Amino acid sequence: MFAVIRRAGFAASLVLVIGATSGCAPIHVHAYAERGTAFTYRTYAWAPDDAVATGDPRLDNNRFFSDQVRASVDRELAARGLEKIMSAPSDLLVHFHATITQEIEIASSNRFEHCYNCRDMIYDVGTLVIDLVDGRTSRLVWRGWVEKLNPVIDNQDWMEETIDWAVAQIIKKMPPRT
């Protein structure tokens, strides 16, 4: 009997944790690969940073954020057998983009025409995009992104965890090396 309660308690705790960390909207992970591209790439390097600002001071010139994204991508690509190089031309160039926007969700328990007991929730959602560009042809060969991410920029530990998780989910969508 206690084993059943313990299992049910664990399951309920897990659901609570997942619900609490998932934000107001479901997180979506997507990827596109250029058709016909054989992923025989062995090396990669980081492309130069964008000079275009996002307009969000939480992201623009935020070295903590960009360094964490780069470290997470480096770790995930190394786990897939890609070697990071600094000097010679690389097989792939890696680039990332990030945005944070506000969304409004209106919730009501009333299903009729008037909105009684309505409440609106304003929350931030983030999108993180990772691009892989063929180093020889300069063509985009793969793009992966996560959207509806709950961006936690003002807490370093949460930011690092969120970025690590998001990058891992994105890189899982990469085609296998051939």
Model features per residue range: what roles?
Residues 55-56, 103-105, 152-154:
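Extracytoplasmic/secreted cell-surface and envelope-processing proteins
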Residues 2, 22-75, 79, 89, ...:
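A structural "domain/chain start" motif
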Residues 74-82, 102, 137, 171-176:
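Sec-exported extracytoplasmic/periplasmic mature domains
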